[in-house]
Regions:
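Residue-level marker of regulatory loop/turn positions in helix-turn-helix DNA-binding domains and
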Residues: 6-10, 41, 56
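Residue-level detection of the helix-turn-helix DNA-binding "recognition helix"
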Residues: 22, 38-39, 54, 83
């Protein structure tokens, strides 16, 4: 059943960003991910990643794209549309 985007609080990728970091070999810390995103030209800190993962911060489309590239995962997967 499709979920209504109007009922979602925070962001829809919070858990998947955390899981995506854990799936890396070796697992990636929030600091590692922030460093990688900064190297790719995005101003992202470990604190921001923490807030995203705790569903305390929204993620814009450009950030979602960069997170997917940094983690080597599709945007659809990060949004929970793929297993």
């Amino acid at each position: 059943m499709a979920r209504s985007l109007f009922l979602i609080k925070g962001n829809i990728c919070a858990e998947r960003v955390r899981l995506g970091r854990a799936m890396q070999k070796p697992p990636m810390t929030q600091e590692d991910l922030a460093r990688k995103l900064q190297f790719m030209g995005m101003d992202m800190t470990a604190l921001i990643i923490s807030r995203i993962e705790k569903n305390q911060r929204h993620v814009c489309d450009a950030e979602l794209l960069m997170l997917s590239k940094a983690l080597g995962l599709s945007m659809d997967w990060l949004c929970g549309n793929e297993d």
